Structures are given as structure tokens and as C-alpha cells.
Amino acid sequence: METTTSSPNAVASPQPQRRRNRWLLWTGRILLGLLALIVLLAASGAAYEAIMATGDARRYPPPGQLVDVGGHRLHLHCVGQGSPTVVLDAGLGEFSLAWGAVQPQAATSTRVCAYDRAGLGWSEPGPSQRSPQQFAAELHMLLTKSGERGPYVLVAHSISGKTARLFASQHPNEVAGMVLVDARHEAVDERLTLEQLTAEDDQQRQFQNMIKWMARFGLVRLLWAPAWPSVQPGSENLSPETRTAIGVLQARPRQIENALAEGAARTDSNSLLRSAAPLGDKPLIVLASAQSIDHLPFWRKHSKA
């Protein structure tokens, strides 16, 4: 009976190696194709955003005037006649059109001005340092240079409440009264622990980076602008033209970056606010939403102080 033994020098079949090489080749081609597709989509998105942003200036011209406040211009829109002049300051990341339903009605009885903080709406970007203290200084210069005379009634929403309080403390003779609409008090920030603040800042930083990149490639414009009216409470009170303009202008990369910068600097002027002079015997109205944040009792306590 014969037995067969394999030679130690026998060569393995080349088929498995060939299949492996073929698989690696096709995998590389697929990955390269996906990379090329991603680059193409990114370039197309960036081009789309650039083209649309160029057209925004033509489609949505500023309703007011641009006033130089020291190296950059701020947008100021005033209507109506009478005194005192009402100055409307929008909330975090918002601009003058947020008052689109309020300003025309209030202007039937007095002078009403709405403005855009630096980098928002139609205003040009300003210094990198964005804080309520900086906002108050720029607002005072804006009103002075534009020729809008006081005394002013300051109407401030959200984070702008800090700006209004600093403005009133620094220029008491130019303020006739104040209306705070869901204004944020510095004590709300101070009740958070260092761990909570750090966690909040980390989450915001991650969110900021994601939104910035989405905006640069046109994704925010595509997704946010059409959806804005359906997710923003009170938007039904605005005209269709105003709703469209807000959705488009808020989706621009510049708008988003400056809005995020405002949020990052939300606590920068808290020490000044703690020592700010009170409004005294001048009229003060505090408006709070019936559906507010979870720490509303704490907010109410300090808004009455």
C-alpha cells in the first residue's frame, strides 16, 4: 500500500492571497470614493452658503441705518414720534426683527428703536470680547451718534436684561424706566456649582463646534431656516416676510458664531451687576412667561430685588 507525503517545500495555493488582495483593492477604492464624495459635498455646501449669503444682502436690506460705533457699524431702526424713546434689545442670539410684532404697535404712541448687537442681524462684527458691559457701551455710543435723544425706556429680553441694568447704572440720567422680559439674573448663574458650570461649558463648546461647521457648509440654512417659524413661540404674530427673513439671517455662519460668543460670555459682567446702582424710583416692569425655566422660583426671587 502506497502512502503519499507532502514535501516541506510545497508552495501554498495563490488563490487565497489573490482574493485578499482583490478585497483590499476594492475596499480602498470604496473608501477613496466615499472620501471624494464627502469632499465634493462639503465643497458644494460651502459654495452654496457663499452664494446664498451674497444674495442675502440684496434680498433682505436693513430697514434702518448703520451707525459707526468705533471701528464697526451697528444697525438701528427707529419709527414713530414722541418721548420717551423706547429702546428694544433682543435676547441671546436674536436681533431687531424679533420685535417685529411689538415695534409697530408701540410706535403708534411714541418713538421706538430696535437695534442689532455686533455681528447679529445687519450689524457688523465688533471686538472679540462680547459681554453685557461691552454691549452697554456700544448701545450708548449708538444712541448718541445716531442723534436719538433720551431719556430712554429700555426694554430688554433674556440676557439683554444685564445690558439694560448696566446701561441704567452707568447713565442714570438718560434712563426713564425699564421693562425686563424674562431677563436673566446673575444669581441664576451663581447658583450653579463649579462642576455644573464646567459640564455646561463643555456641552456648549461641543454644540458650538458642530453648529459652526454645519453653518459653513449650508446645512443650518437648509434645515433651520424653513423650520424656524414652527419651533419659535410667537412667530405666528410676525408677518410671513419677517418670519422668512429671521429664519434666513439667523442661519448665517456669522450670526451663529456671534450668538455663540454671546452665550459663552454670559457670566463675564456678573461682578459689575452685583455692584450696579439700583434703578431707584424710576418705573420698572418685570414680565415673566407662564411657561418658564425649571428654576423660575429662584429667578423670581432675584428679579424682585
Residue ranges and their predicted role:
Residues 132, 174-175, 179-305:
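Flexible "cap/lid" subdomain of the alpha/beta-hydrolase fold that forms the substrate-access gate
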Residues 98-100, 123-129, 190-191:
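Conserved catalytic-core motifs of eukaryotic protein kinase domains, centered on the activation segment
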Residues 87-91, 157, 182:
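The conserved beta1-alpha1 loop
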Residues 77-79, 117-155, 171:
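Active-site loop/oxyanion-hole signature of alpha/beta-hydrolase fold enzymes
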Residues 166-170:
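Active-site signature of alpha/beta-hydrolase-fold catalytic machinery across serine-
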